[in-house]
């Protein structure tokens, strides 16, 4: 018994599929229809085994035959049988489809995770806001009357320094000085210095 050390190459044999592929390369529509009829079940089967989804498999099989129509001239009969060439195209296209779908799914997951706003605890936010307001009101009580009035008019009613000085009938420089001192006092009281 002799061991085979080299792969055995079968002599080149022309088949009906070889002839059909050559005719398809010349844009023969009837030859394309015949090639499709003879090979579609095996090509579709290969694609379905990879994709496991009938809808995607049908679409991918259609893409494969479009590729066959466009590139039948690139088939080299010396490299393998027409069926091997078709099944190689089918397998590659199906694997490409799987990779494409996985990449799209990952992009959607990343987008979804990035675009979801973190949950907001409205109760906690309300409690914090009420506590901050209470602290500010308590600290405002530690200011002089002129400081407190000037800050209330400027920050709560939105008046300018000039408008505050007119409303309180006080010099503009005095108002600015009292507000600066009042804000410094609030910062100290609130522990923000």
Curated annotation (Swiss-Prot):
It holds the Pfam family Sigma70_r4. Keywords: DNA-binding, Sigma factor, Transcription, Transcription regulation. The sigma-70 factor domain-2 mediates sequence-specific interaction with the -10 element in promoter DNA, and plays an important role in melting the double-stranded DNA and the formation of the transcription bubble. The sigma-70 factor domain-2 mediates interaction with the RNA polymerase subunits RpoB and RpoC. A motif (Polymerase core binding) lies at residues 59-62. Sigma factors are initiation factors that promote the attachment of RNA polymerase to specific initiation sites and are then released. Extracytoplasmic function (ECF) sigma factors are held in an inactive form by an anti-sigma factor until released by regulated intramembrane proteolysis. PANTHER family: ECF RNA POLYMERASE SIGMA FACTOR SIGK (PTHR43133:SF66), RNA POLYMERASE ECF-TYPE SIGMA FACTO (PTHR43133). Interacts transiently with the RNA polymerase catalytic core formed by RpoA, RpoB, RpoC and RpoZ (2 alpha, 1 beta, 1 beta' and 1 omega subunit) to form the RNA polymerase holoenzyme that can initiate transcription. Interacts (via sigma-70 factor domain 4) with anti-sigma-K factor RskA. Belongs to the sigma-70 factor family. ECF subfamily. The keyword Transcription applies. GO terms for molecular function: DNA binding; sigma factor activity. Residues 140-187 are annotated as: Sigma-70 factor domain-4. One of its GO terms (biological process) is DNA-templated transcription initiation. The gene is sigK. Residues 161-180 bind DNA. The lineage of its organism: Bacteria, Bacillati, Actinomycetota, Actinomycetes, Mycobacteriales. This is ECF RNA polymerase sigma factor SigK. The keyword Transcription regulation applies. It comes from the Bacteria. Extracytoplasmic function (ECF) sigma factors are held in an inactive form by an anti-sigma factor until released by regulated intramembrane proteolysis (RIP). RIP occurs when an extracytoplasmic signal triggers a concerted proteolytic cascade to transmit information and elicit cellular responses. The membrane-spanning anti-sigma factor is first cut extracytoplasmically (site-1 protease, S1P), then within the membrane itself (site-2 protease, S2P, Rip1), while cytoplasmic proteases finish degrading the regulatory protein, liberating SigK. Residues 35-101 are annotated as: Sigma-70 factor domain-2.
């Amino acid at each position: 018994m002799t061991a085979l050390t080299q792969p055995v190459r079968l002599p080149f044999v022309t088949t009906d599929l070889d002839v059909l592929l050559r005719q398809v390369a010349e844009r023969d529509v009837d030859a394309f229809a015949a090639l499709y009829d003879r090979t579609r079940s095996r090509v579709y089967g290969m694609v379905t085994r990879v994709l496991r989804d009938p809808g995607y498999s049908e679409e991918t099989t259609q893409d494969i035959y479009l590729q066959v129509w466009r590139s039948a001239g690139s088939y080299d009969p010396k490299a393998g049988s027409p069926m091997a060439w078709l099944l190689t195209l089918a397998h590659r296209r199906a694997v490409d489809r799987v990779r494409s779908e996985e990449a799209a799914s990952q992009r959607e997951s990343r987008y979804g995770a990035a675009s979801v706003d973190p949950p907001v605890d409205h109760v906690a936010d309300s409690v914090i806001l009420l506590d901050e307001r209470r602290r500010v009101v308590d600290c405002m009580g530690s200011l002089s009357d002129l400081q407190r009035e000037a800050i209330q008019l400027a920050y709560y009613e939105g008046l300018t320094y000039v408008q505050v000085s007119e409303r309180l009938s006080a010099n503009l420089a005095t108002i600015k000085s009292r507000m600066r001192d009042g804000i410094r006092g609030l910062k100290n009281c609130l522990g923000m210095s």
